Amino acid sequence: MNIAVSTTAEGLSMRPQVQWRVRWESELCLADHVELSEFFRKSYGPTGAFNAQPFENNRSWAGARPEVRVIGYDARGIAAHIGLLRRFIKVGEVDLLVGELGLYAVRPDLEGLGITHSMRVMYPVLHELGVPFGFGTVRPALEKHITRMLGRQGLARLLSGIRVRSTHPDVYLNLPTTRSDDALVLVLPIVRSIGEWPTGTVIDRNGPEL
């Protein structure tokens, strides 16, 4: 499944022309993974060498592996990326099917140009998959950015005061098997309304973060 969307259609003159494609994981070839791995190392590297480390050896995912990706391309190659994985999480005592969003990155030279608004191309993918909700976690520093990108259009809501528990992607002898984070929870109502999101102050992924 491929979708190409030109960002110039949204009328923002500062925004570079980017073509968006929706790619299932099994559609990616070795060259795609090599290119994505380099893109993630360059995108996550400025935030700390530790954050770029998972993408060594041509690996194009950090924790859980996505099943579908939205990838933006421009004349210089990969410009932006977001991944999606359908999974069951536990919100309080309720098991819930969600489409988890993660592996979000924008090429460093494009930061601040508004390109991240085009990540909304993932929204119709969530509808096509028929999941009740889209779900993700974001750092508090990105609250204003996410609100501007999705919240004001009524596409999503940010929830605070929730602890999210995940497993590590690998087993480490010097670490517990799980970790817990106090992060903002991003909820996108898709098939069900935001009022149907279960109450609960703890979310368990029962797996690694995407």
Swiss-Prot record:
The gene is nodA. The keyword Cytoplasm applies. Its main location: cytoplasm. It is found in: Cytoplasm. This is Nodulation protein A. N-acyltransferase required for nodulation. Acts in the production of a small, heat-stable compound (Nod) that stimulates mitosis in various plant protoplasts. InterPro entries: NodA (IPR003484), Nodulation_prot_NodA_CS (IPR020567). PROSITE patterns: NODA. It comes from the Bacteria. It is an enzyme of class 2 (transferase). One of its GO terms (cellular component) is cytosol. Belongs to the NodA family. The lineage of its organism: Bacteria, Pseudomonadati, Pseudomonadota, Alphaproteobacteria, Hyphomicrobiales. Its EC number is 2.3.1.-. Keywords: Acyltransferase, Cytoplasm, Nodulation, Transferase. GO terms for molecular function: acyltransferase activity.
